[in-house]
Amino acid sequence: MAEERIQKIMSEQGLCSRRAAEQIIAEGRVKVNGHPVKVGDKMDPNRDVLHVDDERIYIQKNQQMYYLALYKPRGYVTTASDELGRKTVMELVADIPARLYPVGRLDKDSEGLLLMTNDGAFAQAVTHPSGGISKLYRVTVQPRADEAQILKLSSGVVLDDGTKTMPCAINVVTDEPGRTVMEMTLKEGKNREIRRMCEAVGLEVIRLKRNAEGVVKLGMLQPGKYRELTKAEVTGLRAAAAKGRAQTRSAALQSKAAARRPRGPVGGNKASAGKKHK
């Protein structure tokens, strides 16, 4: 077998996404034949020996791919393991005979739809920012959100680290004294983004539930349970990610073209610039 990039092999073996593999390699946690490797290095899966965090990884060929929709309950962390001993989502899919990992994340206090897979290329496509796959959340905040706060959230707010969020769609479900329940549709995935957005406008999130990601709906799935995605759902997510990447590339090219376009003389037409109007 020909040599392949190590981060590609790691993602295909279900260790993590390709981006996460690059980070792990950069941290010096990966060795091939006993030697540390760099991002971009290659190995022969048939000949070379791979270790991650000093654990040998036995490379499986032609393994079955799994694509799951999991209802992550509150109280579980979205990691493969946790140094603090907290419950992880891996415990909820322990019966799957493959090394799965989460596609994206939900913080410990949030609940709802979480995709899981052992297909690194799929995870990379779905989570990459250029894909722009929409995610639907049901968010309960306190105190009651007024029109100005909702307008700020939908228009994009500046977070505590100085970055500004993209505009998002908001639909108020219930509005009563002391609290508001709304549906928010986002196309980006900053860390704890919705909670930080609400904090920026003076609101506290008391419940956050993801109900959909692209074509995949949480539906009647119960907390802690999972189901396999249909072929149509897997295809739909891939198609949405590809469309998003194409739109991102097109926008970037248009922006570059506009930046290169020659500008006219400052002040308009030089011939008429000195004329006095009576």
Task: List PLM regions with ranges.
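Basic, flexible Lys/Arg- and Gly-enriched helix-loop patches that mediate nucleic-acid binding at interfaces
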Residues: 1-278
